[in-house]
Swiss-Prot record:
Pathway: Glycan biosynthesis; glycogen biosynthesis. It comes from Bacillus cytotoxicus (strain DSM 22905 / CIP 110041 / 391-98 / NVH 391-98). Belongs to the glycosyltransferase 1 family. Bacterial/plant glycogen synthase subfamily. Keywords: Glycogen biosynthesis, Glycosyltransferase, Transferase. GO terms for molecular function: alpha-1,4-glucan glucosyltransferase (ADP-glucose donor) activity; alpha-1,4-glucan glucosyltransferase (UDP-glucose donor) activity. This is Glycogen synthase. InterPro entries: Glyco_trans_1, GS/SS, Starch_synth_cat_dom.
Amino acid sequence: MNILFAVSECVPFIKSGGLADVAGALPKELKKLGVNVRIMLPNYSLIPANLRESFKLHKVIHVPLGWRNQYCGILKGEQDGITYYLIDNEYYFKRDSLYGHYDDGERFSFFSKAILESIPYLDFEVDLIHSHDWHTAMVNFLLHEKYKDNPLYEKIKTVYTIHNLQFQGVFPREVIHDLLELGDEYFNSEQLEFYGNINFMKGGIIAADHITTVSSTYKEEIQYEFFGEKLDGLLRKYNDKLSGIVNGIDTSVYNPRLDSYITATYDVDTLYAKRENKWALQHYFGLPEKENTPIISMVTRLTKQKGLDLVRAVFQEIMQEDVQCIILGSGDSEYEQFFEWMAYEYSEKVKVYIGFNEELAHQVYAGSDLFLMPSLFEPCGLGQLIALTYGVIPIVRETGGLNDTVKSYHVETKSGNGFTFTNFNAHDMLYTVRRALRYYEDPAVWNQLVKQAMTEDHSWKTSALAYKDLYNRLLKLS
């Protein structure tokens, strides 16, 4: 089977969030299962030159966009055995950031149309298009409404993955006529209309042959008003074509036994080496090098979604415990300033790195004991999966992918891989942190918990098998 991934970002070329990690790792795992996957993304000027230089011009076409025919170069290259196509147009993709521009509706209308217009010119007969998030959602809708009468397209199936329902691609009504070349009959509540505007994600949901989300719990949550971002009714309507497949992590990147970024490599049989990473982390941040004081870390975007209001509410109570705390991330200024203030107030216990540093992030995972992730909502989450892989015990709220991947430890049955709480409540979180700290004081219990976490499989293998089965069912190959 031939699968075309349509994505707005992809590791190793360009990344702004978890979508890029998925687009980079899942195709590699699918390839191991015999699936022929190719990936199409924009040729951003921000892609490093050393990654771009191996691409060759495959074809030049023109994409109809309203009254214009826009230049579209199709570049072709290979990376790690996977074929990639870059859609080239400097007007749309030579920018200083991936998103957040006044003409994003036009940019990704062009990209969606370019994907479809390029299909006849690829040396690759596309059986199924797998699109992701709002940026390529209209591929599904346009394919269904404008291209299906063409024999080249009539058999193509679509899978649409929602990574984060919060970002939907909502644009003025004029986009329907001026860019998508669709008539007024599509501007109604059963089609693209969304509170007076149009909604790309809504179009993707309506037209896709199947919809996936990035965890089973998130699939259920988004059908309720609290999580549904005004699309919960639509998702309930299409529940029969909606499923949840939890993400994995790329174990060629996140593997403490092979990680070149950390001070000392280790695995479940050489856990004694993990303490060297803890000492190195304490030394790097200027923390007292105390082996028996647990390090609680957060590697995260500093935003409301990540549950930082809970952390802020009880942080000073956490500081009354014998702990050290390391925060790595950037985001909203109110949270950045709060953690910088805490680092000043508790200079012997709290250290903060505002920004992101890939090498340092690996060292934080390797050197920490506990990983705090009390999200308000979390479609899947990668941080807790990386933490488990590195033997760092997560403390999470039971939402989305956190609920699917972290199970609370029970001392009687010795089951579980972390500590969880249900309500979005600061003192529930505080109680759970204190509970985890009590177990940390018992080395026998803690070592067993760490080993259980590290022996779980959080790779993409299980997820890739689920996606292959889904593709097979849609293509009726099984």
